[in-house]
Amino acid sequence: AAGDPHYRIWMTHTPEGTVIDDPLQLGTTMNQHVSYTGAAVSMYTHMGTHIDALNHFGLDGKIWNRFAAKDHAGDRGWRVAGVENFPPIVARGVLIDVAAAKGKPMLDDGYRITRADIEQALQRQKVELQTGDVVLLRPGRMQEYENAHAYMQNPPGLGYHAARYLVETAGAMVVGADNLSLEAFPSQLESDYVPVHTYLLAEQGTPIIELAYLEDLSRDQVYEFAFIGSPLKFRGADAAPLRPTAFPLD
């Protein structure tokens, strides 16, 4: 998306190559006896299931806590608000299955989730949000994941006013979804092309989880669970891969 680099992994050491190169100077006999494999990875920080840090988007040159890029960002990342500052997240998780509430496997392209949609889904699920929840919305977009073009093209997502409801009224600590960008496009605000991101990250200090796999929770109708997830501690980074786990409460 947006010219982001692809994920790449390449083997820096192979069992056969180690015998030839002998990088540890152990000799042919030892290298033939003990095989060695190593690899390197290059990736964009927002690939796969990941969490956005509070420095990912800002407004008027400033991110969360009014930290300015000119003062706190360098060529090796931000010196403040990097994803390495996130502790392990252990909280009550809530799935809001908006697609299922509307009787659809997936919301229509470009559909913008409203507060009414969220309230309808919660009523159907017989669940109430609580302060400090990790709230995960399911537009159902993950069903297109294997088709990258379809997955990324005009996805349904969270509306700006619904995002404000989740934070200001419901008290969500983290907000996420199964789509690429959480929010729907085009923007509802002429002054901001990503208003949900800037509102959550720059104004409210609310991390965002994207590309969350929610299909199994939806299938099993697990709407409340213990959420546990820890991002990789990339110092100064604006996001990092996250491997979340949901433990049903019942």
What label would you give each PLM region?
Residues 1-250:
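Active-/binding-site microenvironments in catalytic and ligand-binding cores
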